[in-house]
Design a protein with these regions (language model features):
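Peripheral, non-transmembrane regulatory/ligand-interaction domains of membrane transport proteins
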Residues: 1-222
């Protein structure tokens, strides 16, 4: 699925086609959509396909005036009739060039939803570096939110486990521990990527960008 958004009159709004200063949002793109991103919009094929590999690791690289930032995004999904929440991560590619910014990921997620629905204030899609950093900040904030949820669920489930010793609670505890491993690994690799960006060699940072990036790093370290 491909959608296009642009900040109009201070609000992120959906538009019908690519424009300078817009945000191209690709969620589980079909092969024709991938070809459109590569052949028509001129994005690097390896950059576009990077986030379509579940095992892709966080990194930042640049190629012919395009910059790729790969980070893991935390996810939370209910998977059974008893509404057990399963926490995991998936890669997201953020690609910038001199015209627009593109995000690519395998599934819809809370970060993309918040941004596309205009729920995040002060988003300017034409300020590509600032927008990229705001995406990273929302990801870091979402990690913190989910970690707090995991902590709360773990506490409640452990108390139930002591009282009932049922398999359900034991399975949930094991699932939460697995989620924490995913999150820990993702946050460590994301922190390394952010430190590379902070050096300013791949992405040009202005003073305001540096301050925003430092806020992102603080959030990641807290998580």
């Amino acid at each position: 699925m491909l959608n296009f958004y642009k900040t109009i009159d201070g609000k992120v709004s959906q538009i019908h086609a690519v424009e300078d200063g817009c945000w191209v949002c690709a969620i589980c793109p079909t092969e024709p959509e991938v070809r459109y991103l590569v052949d028509v919009l001129g994005l690097e094929q390896d950059f576009v396909r990077a986030a379509l590999d579940e095992e892709e690791s966080s990194r930042v690289e640049s190629e012919e005036e395009q910059t790729l930032v790969i980070v893991d995004v935390p996810t939370a999904e209910r998977q059974d009739e008893e509404k057990t929440v399963v926490y995991s991560t998936m890669p997201m590619a953020i690609i910038t060039n001199n015209r627009f910014i593109t995000t690519v990921c395998l599934r819809e997620n809370a970060v993309i939803s918040e941004l596309s629905q205009g729920l995040v204030k002060n988003i300017q899609t034409h300020l590509r570096t600032q927008f990229l950093l705001n995406i990273l900040l929302r990801i870091a904030t979402r990690f913190l939110q989910y970690l707090k949820q995991i902590d709360k669920i773990s506490y409640t489930t452990e108390n139930l486990l002591h009282q009932t010793m049922r398999n359900k609670e034991l399975i949930q505890i094991l699932g939460l521990e697995k989620s924490l491993v995913y999150f820990s690994t993702s946050l460590k690799s994301t922190e390394v990527t952010l430190e590379k960006i902070l050096r300013g060699r791949i992405i040009k940072l202005y003073d305001a960008d540096e301050e925003l990036l430092e806020d992102v790093i603080i959030e990641v370290k807290q998580a």
